[in-house]
């Protein structure tokens, strides 16, 4: 059976197509955790995210995937490899010398639940395993229950919880 979308490997030249997909993630963050407002602007979040992606894509083990539907980018995923000592994991758990991080995964809202995210995760995980990496980490907002459920179905478990207190936020948390 042919899927209505296709997934291809991307590079830094594809970052303009990623911008609205990252902005959708940013909006999802605002929606699921409005109590953390104010959030940075769409332009500012993309400026910072783009700089991160450019730096990661300059490394040879980073993989960017784009999901396309009729040549329109409808999702992306990005994974890279960290030395164990660059992570918060090394001083607590026994791991291999390198740890794979699923840095980002995004699917446009109208196609969430279609299998695109799972297919991209399959490919990102396979890439990391091909690089000899067996230990994986990723992050998600705790109130993004759909994402957390997807990751837990795939064997990811909560390992670390950051608690934040930002100044000048509502005090009715």
Indicate residue ranges for each PLM-predicted region.
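Conserved N-terminal entry element of GNAT/NAT acetyltransferase domains
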Residues: 1-20, 24, 28, 35, ...
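Conserved GNAT-fold acetyl-CoA-binding loop/helix
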Residues: 27-52
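A short helix-loop-beta-strand connector motif used in the catalytic cores of GNAT acetyltransferases and
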Residues: 47-65, 84, 101
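Conserved beta-strand in the GNAT
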Residues: 66, 72-80, 101, 106
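Conserved acyl-donor/pantetheine-binding loop and adjacent beta-alpha core of acyl/acetyltransferases
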Residues: 78-101
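Conserved acetyl-CoA-binding loop-helix of GNAT-fold acetyltransferases
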Residues: 104-107, 113-126, 130, 149, ...
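Conserved beta-strand-loop-alpha-helix junction that forms the acyl-donor binding cleft
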Residues: 112, 123-124, 137-147, 164-169
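Conserved acetyl-CoA-binding loop of GNAT-fold acetyltransferases
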Residues: 151-161
């Amino acid at each position: 059976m042919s899927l209505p979308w296709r997934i291809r490997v991307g590079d830094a030249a594809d970052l303009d197509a990623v911008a609205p997909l990252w902005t959708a993630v940013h909006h999802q963050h605002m929606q699921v955790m409005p109590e953390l407002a104010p959030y940075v602007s769409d332009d500012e979040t993309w400026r910072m995210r783009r700089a991160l992606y450019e730096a990661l894509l300059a490394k040879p083990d980073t993989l960017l995937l784009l999901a396309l539907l009729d040549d329109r980018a409808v999702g992306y995923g990005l994974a890279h490899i960290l030395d164990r000592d660059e992570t918060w994991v090394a001083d607590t758990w026994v791991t291999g010398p390198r740890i794979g991080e699923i840095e980002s995964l995004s699917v446009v809202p109208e196609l969430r639940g279609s299998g695109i995210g799972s297919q991209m995760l399959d490919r990102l995980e396979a890439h990391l395993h091909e690089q000899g990496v067996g230990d994986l980490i990723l992050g998600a907002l705790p109130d993004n229950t759909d994402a957390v459920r997807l990751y837990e179905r795939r064997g990811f478990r909560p390992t670390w919880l950051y608690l934040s207190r930002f100044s000048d936020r509502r005090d009715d948390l």
